[in-house]
Regions:
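Active-site neighborhoods and metal-handling regions in enzymes and metal-associated proteins
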Residues: 2-425
Length: 425
């Protein structure tokens, strides 16, 4: 981890599919051993039942399947049971297929053909006091149990057990947002891979002023990732700010000398996601540096980043961080817009939001508490005038990925503190 990122970093080695599977399964085994007992203790549940159907995976179940299983088949049921007394958490699967040795098979269809009855018998035999099911009106991450599967599951239980059902929202968010030491050994390298590819697009190799369009750059990223065998979780966004033009230009806009290029880019690798926004300036003929006003705008965004990362505290809400960071930034005479979010198994990950681009006030989605051992996308904008452009106000969008250990926020692979320069010829 570093404060300042390397300009145009070299592309790190990319694992083969087989080697990726080995790493993914090692991470998953470690997470199941390490995170699940913690989750069940924190949320005071002794059983957690997750159900996924083929082509309709619960977002949590999708992160618990080994690299060969990949998807739910027919109906995949996972059960975690904490017997208490210091005994290890049971990991069971009530399904026809094994799951990489990570869950103990607990259904013999020859003995009990009805999968729901088999599950009900398993639950009754353990007599849990709280049974978490993934049903939530507040979070999609805790709402993966479909209506039909919920109804059939509940119908199979005794009235007494039905009364013990609680929402799996809390456990789902905790499982998804928590990063392990093993993951954090790898995450900086994953972001370095993203930074390397992003840097390729912000270079003369790709950008030919007067010829290349912003869409050309976006599709370069898609093609490059396909070539590397790496996924993206969203289509890259590329646009330009131009002197004399108020709004961001994109689509078939031809990039010209003097343009400020903005790119929003993210990858998925080893099941973890990145999310980065960087800025590049296309030099005019005879220029050797960007205008001072553009450099000052990026510096203003860096100061807002400092305001956000400096506001992190364990146990406060995303709304609290938003309010504190905005006050700090505005007290410095800055004009911020803050819309940061958790990052991990999902690009817009589980956990509290820290503002939204269209809402800088407290939001129900920002009420959750901030926990240590979590990764964040520090996403925001600084609005600043550019004297060289006649005082035109420009939105300097930045986004950098960082880890919060409970004490400090550290960037996984540094952050952009100087504009990337692209020659005009």
């Amino acid at each position: 981890m570093a404060e300042t990122e390397v300009a145009h970093p070299a592309l790190p080695p990319i694992l083969s599919p087989r080697d990726r599977a080995t790493v993914i399964d090692a991470i998953l085994a470690d997470r199941l051993d390490r995170v699940i007992p913690q989750v069940m203790q924190v949320h005071q549940i002794d059983m957690w039942v997750l159900v996924a159907r083929e082509y309709l995976e619960d977002p949590v179940v999708a992160t618990m399947l080994d690299a060969k299983s990949l998807r739910a088949r027919r109906r995949t049921i996972l059960v975690f049971y904490n017997p208490g007394g210091g005994k290890p958490v049971e990991r069971l699967t009530v399904s026809r297929y094994g799951l990489g040795g990570l869950f103990q098979p607990a259904w013999n269809p020859d003995v009990e053909p009805d999968q729901w009855k088999a599950l009900a018998q398993l639950i009754a035999a353990r007599n849990p006091q709280k049974i978490a099911l993934n049903v939530s009106s507040k979070s999609a991450f805790g709402d993966g149990l479909t209506k039909s599967q919920h109804d059939e599951l509940v119908a199979a239980l005794t009235p007494q057990l039905r009364e013990r059902i609680v929402s799996g929202e809390g456990p789902s968010i905790s499982w998804l947002e928590t990063r392990t030491p093993m993951e954090m050994q790898l995450y900086p390298g994953i972001l370095r891979l993203a930074h390397a590819v992003l840097g390729e697009g912000h270079s003369a190799k790709v950008v030919k002023p007067g010829v290349t369009t912003t869409d050309d750059v976006a599709w370069f990223y898609r093609a490059r990732l396909s070539e590397l065998g790496v996924d993206t979780w969203f289509h890259p966004s590329v646009g330009v700010h131009r002197q004399g033009v108020k709004d961001l230009l994109s689509g078939d806009t031809v990039i010209q000398p003097g343009d400020l290029i903005w790119t929003d880019f993210g990858i998925t690798y080893l099941r973890l996601n990145t999310d980065t926004q960087h800025l590049a300036y296309v030099l005019k003929p005879g220029e050797t540096d960007a205008p001072a006003g553009l450099k000052a705008g990026l510096a203003a965004a860096n100061r807002i980043q400092d305001a956000v990362t400096g506001a992190f505290q364990v146990g406060i809400s995303g709304n609290d961080i938003l309010a504190a960071a905005r006050k700090t930034a505005m007290d410095q005479g800055l004009k911020p817009s803050i819309y940061s979010h958790p990052l991990g198994y999902h690009g817009h990950g589980a956990g509290p939001a820290i503002g939204f681009w269209d809402n800088q006030n407290p939001d129900p989605r920002g009420e959750g508490r901030v926990n240590p051992g979590t990764v964040w996308s520090i996403e925001l904008s600084a609005f600043a005038p550019v004297p060289e452009w006649g005082g035109q106000e420009v939105q300097f969008r930045t986004e950098e990925d960082a880890f919060y250990d409970g004490k400090t926020v550290r960037y996984l692979d540094g952050r952009q503190t100087s504009l990337t320069l692209i020659p005009s010829k």
